[in-house]
Design a protein with these regions (language model features):
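Membrane-proximal basic amphipathic "stem/tether" segments
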Residues: 1-43
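SAM cofactor-binding core of SAM-dependent methyltransferases
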Residues: 43-139, 143-151
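A short, conserved alpha-helix within the catalytic core of class I
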Residues: 155-163
Length: 163
């Protein structure tokens, strides 16, 4: 085994351990957050496992406060889906999801990620517009109420949401 192969193997093992620790800590924080009946501000429940900021905690608090939510999500503009607002929801709460990005390379990376094999996650390469979003969701079995819709497509968020 070459030195480079050994380094790659150790990097993967260490990365895997870090991911497990992040998930375990995230699950503990999610349990703490869901028990809070009220908060003064969203900062009271913020934590980040996969989100860029504290959105994982805010989402966990909200989904336990809003009765009757469909356990489905749609997120656009996800990149490679490593840092995303719905990833913790998928892994921790086992929601069903659809993620979309305009980069074929990034969507291919998502489809090859073990998260796509272990969870009910569909990834689609598409340029999302107000005109095509409904059909993109319908074509993949996402109709009716969506528990969480997350739009991050710099500059067109409002128009797609209105669509």
């Amino acid at each position: 085994m070459s030195l480079l192969s050994k380094i790659a193997m150790w990097a993967e093992l260490l990365g895997s351990g870090e991911a497990k620790q992040r998930m375990l800590i995230g699950r503990q924080l999610a349990w703490r957050v869901r028990e809070l009946e009220s908060i003064n501000e969203f900062a009271d429940v913020e934590f980040s496992v996969f989100s860029q900021f504290g959105d994982d905690g805010i989402i966990q608090w909200l989904i336990h406060r809003l009765p009757g939510l469909s356990e489905t999500f749609v997120e656009f503009g996800v990149g490679c889906y490593q840092e995303a607002n719905t990833r913790f929801l998928l892994v921790n709460n086992n929601w069903r999801g659809l993620v979309l990005d305009s980069s074929r390379r990034k969507v291919h990376a998502i489809s090859r990620d073990t998260i796509s094999l272990l969870h009910d996650l569909q990834s689609v390469c598409a340029v999302v517009t107000a005109e095509n979003i409904d059909q993109l969701m319908l074509d993949r079995g996402f109709e009716g109420d969506i528990g969480l819709l997350h739009i991050d497509i710099d500059g067109n968020d409002y128009w797609v949401w209105r669509g």
